[in-house]
């Protein structure tokens, strides 16, 4: 990894200088937060200067799942809105992006931080502003993503649960119900996990990690955010009111069926990391197991079919 970082910094020498200092900034943790496992981050300082830059190296294990150029363009657009650190330059050969580093006083958000109504409302307002802008230029569907990941894990020696095919079998009726109901496609950050939000002074928020940025159904992102922050549907419903200005069962049902699909997607993506990564213990399997469990519980709810009909 040090060699990759040094090669990337050499490519960025016009910005960081000939002899920059760098240090690992973010340690990867797959479970329970899935934080910094698909990239490595370094604080970078010019010679005899303070750390002003952040170097992000995309993980080789997911290179075929991420469009780095789309991510860089999305990050640039979000920065212009005031929603993210500035991406300065991207190098395709190194799969490296250099950002302006957030100053001291910023930290990675936790779920408890974002459960607070004011912060949740601010995140939704940021997402709506992004959605009102021009398209990212890369259309994505969680169902297409599941198909892609399933082909990878089924071809490998992945540790799939016994009911994995049952969970997969639900994706077709969910997809068909969403398509039959019709949906809009809007630009989005696409991955509202707490670890992709930074908290700063004066309640400031910034979005990071743009690998999932795409043109998507906004209710997918909202459903993911609900599922990330809250355990009970009674807690989730106010987020829909913040987003739409009013609550409707139809929109809420769409969010919830998307949440089930998202859990399956990230369970499978974790298994892809388990298959492709050097031995790292059981963290990826633990995270996959948690996402499979949550998907299983949602699909198994007595009223889940009624949610599909409500679309």
PLM regions and their residue ranges:
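An alpha-helical support segment within catalytic cores of ATP-dependent transferases
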Residues: 4-23, 132-190, 200-202, 247, ...
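Active-site acidic catalytic loop and adjacent metal/ATP-binding pocket
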Residues: 31-55, 172-220
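ATP-binding pocket architecture of kinase catalytic cores
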Residues: 32-33, 37-141, 164-165
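A glycine-centered beta->alpha junction motif in the catalytic cores
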Residues: 59-60, 98-114, 132-135, 148-158, ...
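Short glycine- and hydrophobic/aromatic-rich loop-to-beta-strand nucleating segment
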Residues: 95-99, 192, 229
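Extended, well-ordered alpha-helical scaffold segments
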Residues: 119, 162-174, 280-295
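Active-site activation/catalytic loop segments of kinase-like enzymes and analogous catalytic loops
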Residues: 219-250, 260-279, 293-294
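ATP/Mg2+ or Mg2+-diphosphate-binding catalytic cores
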Residues: 269-311
